A protein has these predicted regions:
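Glycine-rich phosphate/diphosphate-binding loop of Rossmann-like nucleotide-binding domains
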Residues: 65-157
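Beta-sheet entry/capping signal
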Residues: 42, 119-120, 171-173
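Solvent-exposed alpha-helices and their adjacent loops that cap or buttress functional pockets
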Residues: 7-8, 33-38, 113-114, 143-144, ...
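N-terminal glycine-rich phosphate/adenylate-binding segment common to multiple enzyme folds
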Residues: 1-75, 81, 85-89, 178
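Flexible loop/turn segments at secondary-structure boundaries
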Residues: 52, 129-131, 160-162
Length: 179
């Protein structure tokens, strides 16, 4: 599947989230109606070909060509003992631009279809990781090119709280591959 994603350029993992009338939610062990179904209608857009999947795609490509997997070797990780495995998590400008532009295009489409304004929320961990800092910076650049769409940004930690507390406030959410 990962090879198909890359080969067919399926870079946007589109995950709609919609509540329907009569479907109860299990909260504190009890099924009940928590949110108004017509108020929760969002779409998560996750980058689908970079990040943690990139090294796996590279290894699959090498195997298909009959080439030997040449892992990047780091002799030690200060502070970690014993066996350690790791995967690089590259995030590119090109990959970020295309998935973020996709999110803005989807928000604009939903705005026309639903007749209500839509927002795009960027979710990342840009306070910690360099790849997410690039992703967030590109989101800010593209936001400025789309003044007709409201924007917000959050670290993944805070976003999980928003998702549970106020799901009706979310429309289109764009995330790097890790989340």
């Amino acid at each position: 599947i990962l090879g198909l994603r890359s080969g067919l350029k399926l870079y946007a993992n589109v995950r709609p989230i919609k509540l329907y009338p009569g479907v109860q939610h299990k909260v504190h062990g009890v099924h009940q109606q928590v949110w108004q179904p017509d108020m929760v209608d969002m779409v998560m857009i996750r980058e689908n070909t970079e990040g943690l999947y990139h090294s796996l795609l590279r290894r699959m490509e090498q195997k298909a060509k009959g080439e030997k997997d040449e892992p990047i070797v780091i002799e030690e990780f200060p502070g970690l003992e014993g066996e350690v495995e790791w995967d690089p998590r590259p995030i590119s400008r090109k990959g970020s631009e295309r998935v973020i532009n996709f999110a803005f295009d989807l928000a604009r489409h939903r705005q026309r279809k639903m007749g209500v304004s839509q927002s795009v929320t960027c979710v990342d961990k840009s306070n910690v990781t360099r790849g997410c800092r690039l992703f967030r910076g590109i989101f800010k650049e593209i936001s400025e090119q789309n003044p007709d769409i409201e924007t917000d940004a959050a670290y993944i930690d805070a976003f999980t709280m928003w998702l549970m507390r106020d799901p009706e406030d979310l429309d289109v959410v764009v995330l790097p591959n890790m989340f």
